[in-house]
Amino acid sequence: MVVSLLEKVRALNPIVANVANGVTIDQVANAQNAIGASPIMSNAPEEAEGIVTIAQAITINIGSLWAPQIQEMMALMTAAYQQQKPVVLDPVAVGSLAYRQQIIEQLLILDTPTLIRGNAGEIAYFAGIDWQANGIDAGHGNSDPVIIAKAAANCLHTIILLTGPTDIITDGQRVTLISNGTSLFQTHVGSGDMLSGLCGAFVAVHPADPYQAAIEAAATFAVAGELVATAMETPLPGTFYPQLIDYLFHITPAKVANTVQLSEVPTHE
């Protein structure tokens, strides 16, 4: 695997505008900053147009909804559409809660996100496939996650990054699998939010190919987490996060390329 976008993020220091989950806002900002991007966080709809103007990408996370934040999400989606800026959407718990589904449907009316990052329970919602989502967690179901991801991508005509023990990236036809990672991602609330933030940084510097941006963001994050867990004498969630930030700061394209376990699913005509 050729890893070219990590150094591009560090060289260009792209501004990524974030409507973040209030639970993990500092984690997302620190992850983006560590990887080389410049995060800006906002909850004020009045500044949405100005923020989109200066940003190279926008990430929207519905993890902790409140009225002014929802208004800004709508304003950001409108401005991003008008200014043709890439948008990463993290639809936290959309598979479990009807109100969140309403908000997502309103956002989709305004524009189609460039990339959607979620777990199986969240992505299954977009695919219209039955899945027993468990709040913010993936839950369980009988469908093949690859089928779920492809169906969602084809329904929305966008890039899907379905995260889990194996990360799945698809545009509805091509499918890339990344098998790195650590179980500590599941014990640290905010891991998915951080990855969505990194997707924003990578797509900011490579908006013409969000599929490749998603692959490289997912590979970088999964490899960093795996290396942290491997290096820890006693892998514990409380010490995992700060070391993950350190690894994101120091990780090199060569380390990602040499460590990533990546495979392509054959395309059947």
Residue ranges and their predicted role:
Residues 189, 200-242:
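Conserved post-catalytic alpha-helical subdomain immediately downstream of the catalytic base
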